[in-house]
Structures are given as C-alpha cells and as structure tokens.
Amino acid sequence: MAALAALLFSGQALANGHGSDAPPPPKPDATTAPARVILTKQGPKLVDLKGMTLYYYERDTSGKTSNCDGKCTQSWTPLSAPTDAKAVGDFTVITRNDGSKMWAYRYRPLYTSPADKEPGDTNGNATTLQWRIARPDE
C-alpha cells in the first residue's frame, strides 16, 4: 500500500512540473496598475486601489513633475509609488521635487483628497477650481 501511495504521489508531482530537472516556470509579473476606472452617474473616474477618488491639479502642466509641494501636500496626498515602480499601461511614475515617486495617469500626477472620507466620495472636487476629478478621457 505504501508503494502505491508513493507511486501516485510521484506521478502527481511530475504532472505538476515538480520532481524534474527542468527549471520552474517564471513567476508572473507582479506589477499592477495603481488605480482603476469605475463608472459613476457623472461618468467614468479614476480611483485608487482602496476606491478613493483620484484628482488632477491644474497647475501640473509639464506632465513630468508635480507642482503640489509643501503645504499643498498637507491638503492633497500624492498617490505615492514605490522607488522601483515601473509604468503600467497609461500609468507612469514621476519623481517629485523631494525625490519621492508618485503615480501619474497619462503623465498627469494623481492625488487623493483628505476631504474624501469614504470610497467613492468626491468632496475634493468642490474645494477649489484648481482640482478636478481624474477621468480617463481627459
């Protein structure tokens, strides 16, 4: 009986690709987009992975830097990216003036608003005319 169990186990291991001299298959790419598009009554918008609304800052014009520094970041939180982050589709990584990395969508830096308390809130949209909900078609 033990011999039969050993034979079945080794056959299953070989069927799964284990137990041979072949190298294991490569691991899937761990890079994922930092945000997603959701549909709302007002149209599609970008949200982070927690469902919080993302915003564009009108003063971010170059597409390669963020103009929200100092006190601005106390009111608007840049969507931070790991130091080794790479572009994923339309999501790019930019370097902020302080050297930290943040995510951008089509080279436009992305931020969250502390005025938004729950996923889907859009309270930051009403704070000033310089901030707008990030939409995939803009």
Residue ranges and their predicted role:
Residues M1-A5:
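Sec-dependent N-terminal signal peptides
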Residues S10-Q12:
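N-terminal signal peptide c-region/cleavage motif recognized by signal peptidases
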Residues L14-E138:
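Compact beta-sheet-dominated domain cores in extracellular/mature segments
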